[in-house]
Amino acid sequence: MPAYRSRTSTHGRNMSGARGLWRATGMTDADFGKPIIAIANSFTQFVPGHVHLKDLGQMVAREIEKAGGVAKEFDTIAIDDGIAMGHAGMLYSLPSRELIADSVEYMVNAHCADAMVCISNCDKITPGMLMASLRLNIPTIFISGGPMEAGKVTYQGETHAVDLIDAMIKGADQNVSDEEALAFEKESCPTCGSCSGMFTANSMNCLIEALGLGLPGNGTVVATHADRKELFLEAGRRIVDLARRAYEGDDASVLPRSIATFQAFENAMTLDIAMGGSTNTVLHLLAAAQEAGVAFGMSDIDRLSRRVPCLCKVAPNVPDVHIEDVHRAGGIMGILGQLDRGGLINRECGTIHARTLAEGLDRWDISRSNDPKVVEFYKAAPGGVRTTEAFSQSKRWAEVDKDRTAGVIRSVDNAFSKDGGLAVLFGNLALDGCIVKTAGVDDKNLTFSGPAVICESQDEAVAKILGGQVKSGDVVIVRYEGPRGGPGMQEMLYPTSYLKSMGLGKECALITDGRFSGGTSGLSIGHVSPEAAEGGAIGLIQAGDIIDIHIPNRSIAIRVSDAELEKRRQAMQALGPKAWKPVDRDRQVSAALRAYAAMTTSAARGAVRDVSQLER
């Protein structure tokens, strides 16, 4: 039987000083020997997805203590990508993922915690904590703060469910009055929680369910609903059981690396493709796989994207459908259930709530479960009241959405499209691949060719789009915004939103070595690898070059010869210190960001640290 890690600091006369300090935190003799459970919270008043988390860590702590454990809470940082968007703040978003992973590792290892509950929610916090949990490989349960309710706006005589992206598009549309734009702004984010569409935060919280590290409903019960409280309480009870199984029962099956196997990563990516999740999830799954020691890469994503259909479309891919509607249709277990029927997932993977995913689906998939409590659970509805309080309402739908023919979640036979919601493209423009969210691409744009409009930064792209320098049929190239070139791999939500507001959302393509918000839709191709700053061909494109995009064939190319590209490469190399750097870009980059850039890898590797640099 492996000893509890915490005994390193709680047992033996030589640890009397440490025990003295533990006693000062409230521990007693009776606590020395119990499992110490770290609660990694992420409360902050900066972020609506985290503003309601302040007291929830202590609520979980009390449940841990009732179950026989000792709970110790700490907080991580949390950046709001929406507030950081469109200015230099976005440079810090992706790098914060590594800081979060490191800080969780530091706290847990420094204090010898035995197990962990991760209370996360928004874009980089869930991935950062996921990376840490796989590094540490101690029993871990994830519980998210939950999605925001969608807003409601009456516009041009019709009432619509709206979200942050609608407000951004209307705010930039000169045909929308100030009063109308303000109405969208005020109603787009009506409650606490992560933004209400299938954006990055909600995508990641849904994928946690597929990986097996979260409870059913983790990704879909709205933050305001009383049912989410039970998820938090159950996480507190269950983590003590997992800790005892791991240490007292020598059961390694409950450890994160035993659960998040190659097959589990396949399940998570399969879900992502089926629900048209954010392209950022690709970065985060690749990064998490590396922490788990799992050889899951772009070729695997490409393979899965060719066989998994699109079973669920949610904003921003379609209007008026949000995460609250996915929950009513059976949530993530409902989507996984349909994928299981199609033979598209690995049903023998373990989870923290059931021995296998198959057993979990038998209980939680509303298409096969006879448990009235499960059906009642998926009736949890938005309350429709502006609030920043968690668990503040208990409204329920009259019935769940079991329609698998034309409902929010479809069967494989009635899929929205045979091809899934994400695709990996390769070609001379992206030798190591790039990502497009096909669920958000209009059918007419699945093949697209047009002349390149070169932008050496996101700011230049915004200026050219709003300044009328981008025309129908153009391909906007935004480069030197990758992990190293940005640095920080900014999201391009403003350029894509402004294309929509200018009436060009379905008339242009945008290609970048940066990334996109989960709120992006349209022909938006990101994560181009290698990036320009690493010598990628995106840095060799010239204004007017024809770019050919063929999503069905998974190809993307600059329409110039190999000889011409080599000629341009040699000319670039001849620039010496100025080679592979943006032209005339005025950007202040802090020492912290320069340190990130010096260590990061390409998007094709998840933009994780190049640890080989540490082996010198």
From Swiss-Prot:
Pfam families: ILV_EDD_C, ILVD_EDD_N
GO biological processes: isoleucine biosynthetic process; L-valine biosynthetic process
Binding, [2Fe-2S] cluster: C122, C195
Reactions catalysed according to its record: (2R)-2,3-dihydroxy-3-methylbutanoate = 3-methyl-2-oxobutanoate + H2O; (2R,3R)-2,3-dihydroxy-3-methylpentanoate = (S)-3-methyl-2-oxopentanoate + H2O
Cystine pairs: none
Cofactor: [2Fe-2S] cluster; Mg(2+)
GO terms of molecular function: 2 iron, 2 sulfur cluster binding; dihydroxy-acid dehydratase activity; magnesium ion binding
Transmembrane segments: none
Top-level taxon of origin: Bacteria
Cofactor note: Binds 1 [2Fe-2S] cluster per subunit. This cluster acts as a Lewis acid cofactor.
Binding annotation for Mg(2+): D81, D123, K124, E491
Pathway in which this enzyme or protein is active: Amino-acid biosynthesis; L-isoleucine biosynthesis; L-isoleucine from 2-oxobutanoate: step 3/4; Amino-acid biosynthesis; L-valine biosynthesis; L-valine from pyruvate: step 3/4
Example of a GO cellular component annotation carried by this entry: cytosol
Keyword set includes DNA damage: no
Main function: Functions in the biosynthesis of branched-chain amino acids. Catalyzes the dehydration of (2R,3R)-2,3-dihydroxy-3-methylpentanoate (2,3-dihydroxy-3-methylvalerate) into 2-oxo-3-methylpentanoate (2-oxo-3-methylvalerate) and of (2R)-2,3-dihydroxy-3-methylbutanoate (2,3-dihydroxyisovalerate) into 2-oxo-3-methylbutanoate (2-oxoisovalerate), the penultimate precursor to L-isoleucine and L-valine, respectively.
Quaternary structure and partners: Homodimer.
The protein, known as: Dihydroxy-acid dehydratase
Annotated organism of origin: Paramagnetospirillum magneticum (strain ATCC 700264 / AMB-1)
Recorded name of the encoding gene: ilvD
